Amino acid sequence: MPATRFSPRTIWLILADAAIIYGGIVLAMYVRLGVSGSEYQLNDRNGWEKIALASLVCLLILYFYDLYDYTVMGNRRELMLRLVQALGIAWALLALLFYFVPSLLIGRGVSVISVPIVLVLLLVWRIFIHLLTGHPEIGEKILVVGTGKSAIDTAEAVWERRDAGYRIVGFVTENGATPHTKIGESEIVGTVDELDSLIKTEKVDRIVIAVRERRGTFPTETLLKMSLAGDVNIEECTSFFERVTGKVHIDMLRPSWLIFAGRRRDTRLKIVIREVAHRGLALAGLIVSFPIAVFTAIVIKLESKGPIFYRQERVGKNGRIFKVIKFRSMRTDAEKDGKPVWATADDNRVTRIGGIIRKIRVDEIPQFWNIIKGEMSFVGPRPERPHFVEQLAEEILFYEHRHLTAPGLTGWAQIKYPYGASVEDARQKLQYDLYYIKNQSLALDLVIIFETVKTVLFSRGGR
């Protein structure tokens, strides 16, 4: 399953959390009201539906607190802290909801008792899952063919994503390297001539091919027989890496892979629906954010002389140049020598108000107008300045391909990679942009929008 979506393990975790929260509240109701009182509330007062709503609110807050990130479960102190905060926020929101809509109330006593019950159940469950997923026998067993950079990068992607459900059992080599040579957390377990026996002894579920040169000793016949017999799944490292990490590894790419693995062509109707939806959402966003925009314009004008808005040339779809609109967040002499400069962390050109509005993304509000005009979409690769595009296209392979789709207000690269100001940062972001272009869909757009909202609410900021 692509890394853009929830992995199967994460989906099971969400479902288990839902059952635990739901069951915990029901248990609290029985503790507080007894059998007869609970059955009356559940059956005659729509208690089942009320508890379902409360459970949904809790799940959303758990998501916003990154409690479906498996790395959080490895730190029990952090896990406990986040669970307490998340459940506290969830029950505060529910209290507010019950105040305005009393018919949804499940009972104050029940609410108070359910908090510690749900907290303990979730904590024990998360610790158990962490111990279980760390067991070496749990997960699909992967044998990597190759020992070069692509092979190592593929294995490291698996080691970094414990939640993906894979285990590297070892590497096989073509050049007769010494068996049992350590490579990261695993080792060389044999050569390509031993593939047949290794599949059985290591109980391999999937072979990942991570060698570029496929002449000479490459075991084409052996792999063909295995594939046709259905003994084991066989996959290119490029596709496997993409699925695990949610990005396309540029160093592994061949033009042929981009051609044959490209996304299916959208129908004209789907394109029109997407454009209408994006423009409609942008118009709604412009209306809803109007009071914030007016207030922002006033404080910008009060703080420093100069225009309220900042217009700058950017490269759009198919290389077309357009002017992006933002609230001005830098001094008017930010580029007094006329040369474009990368934005950096703690950039001293940013004004005090500018720092605040950039942190909570308010400076991006005027870009709703760019979306309405059709120059941008809600979701897509962030538009870059022509000067930097020209520079990066010379240094980074496939860079121009990010302009095959409309630029976005937010994007896959923005939620997956921290902000950067270098060629290497641009290279890393391109890998996420290519993934988005290849896998673009409504479901992926919704995931990105949801993650962006989470980022804004927790003030992780921008540049």
Language-model region placement:
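A hydrophobic, helix-centered structural microdomain
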Residues: K270-A334, N370, L442, V447-R463
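A short, structured surface patch at a secondary-structure boundary
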Residues: A343-A406, I448-V456
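Short, glycine-rich, amphipathic interfacial segments at transmembrane boundaries or analogous
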Residues: G176-T181, T238-D251, Y310-R352, T410-K429
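C-terminal terminal-structure detector
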Residues: K373, H387, E394-R463
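A solvent-exposed beta-alpha-beta segment
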Residues: P2, L15, Y22, V26, ...
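Membrane-cytosol interface motif
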Residues: L83-L87, I138-A157, P307-M330, R352
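Signature of alpha-helical transmembrane segments in polytopic membrane proteins
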Residues: M1-I138, Y166, R274, R463
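Glycine-rich flexible loop motifs, especially short His-Gly-Gly/GGXG/HXGH segments used as catalytic or interaction
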Residues: E187, T245-A284, I308-Q312, W342, ...
